[in-house]
From Swiss-Prot:
Subcellular location: Plastid, Chloroplast thylakoid membrane
UniProt binding sites for (2R,3E)-phycocyanobilin 1: K28, N35, D39, P154, G156, C158
Similarity comment: Belongs to the phycobiliprotein family.
Protein name: Phycocyanin PC645 beta subunit
Organism: Chroomonas sp. (strain CCMP270)
SUPFAM superfamilies noted in UniProt: Globin-like (SSF46458)
Function: Light-harvesting photosynthetic tetrapyrrole chromophore-protein from the phycobiliprotein complex.
């Protein structure tokens, strides 16, 4: 897992150069907007159980066959597994948002995700829809457009953070396709 600092240092080291110029300015911006980033992650993790349950509920409302006797969310065990998987995805997205780097998401969550679901017979479309619902909800929390939040959300313009967060969810959706 690389954070914004490690990524810059690794890049400079591979070129046998000092960190400076544009890289230093990018790190300065990363630090100056650190409180917004922390607030954005806090808004997500403080509402994680609601985000996950709403996403899974939305997926099921759009495809009620998932809770029929032959569906992938039928029985408490399968529903619990679905909620657990969505929670894991959200957790790794929050780690990526906190560090400003998607490598933890890619390395620990996305590798083999599609193949795992395919081997279990889980339809990718439903998973992608649940991820899309989580994406919309998290972007709403970060942009302060959601009315269903437990804590305050980041102050100021957080559109860049919202876009970054959306990009992490897009990576998950792409991994499922």
């Amino acid at each position: 897992m690389l954070d914004a600092f490690s990524r810059v240092v690794t890049s400079a080291d591979s070129k046998a150069a000092y960190v400076g110029g544009a890289d230093l300015q990018a790190l300065k911006k990363f630090v100056s907007e650190g409180n917004k980033r922390l607030d954005a992650v806090n808004a997500i993790v403080s509402n994680a159980s609601c985000i996950v349950s709403d996403a899974v509920s939305g997926m099921i409302c759009e495809n009620p066959a998932l809770i029929s006797p032959s569906g992938n969310c039928y029985t408490n065990r399968r529903m619990a597994a679905c909620l657990r998987d969505a929670e894991i995805i959200l957790r790794y997205v929050s780690y990526s948002l906190l560090s400003g780097d998607s490598s933890v998401l890619e390395d620990r969550c996305l590798g083999g995700l599609k193949e795992t679901y395919a081997s279990l017979g889980v339809p990718a479309a439903g998973n992608a829809r649940a991820v899309g619902i989580m994406k919309a909800t998290c972007v709403g929390f970060i942009n302060n457009t959601s009315n269903q939040k437990k804590l305050s959300t980041p102050a100021g313009d957080c559109s860049a953070l919202a876009s970054e967060c959306a990009g992490y969810f897009d990576k998950v959706t792409s991994a499922l396709a």
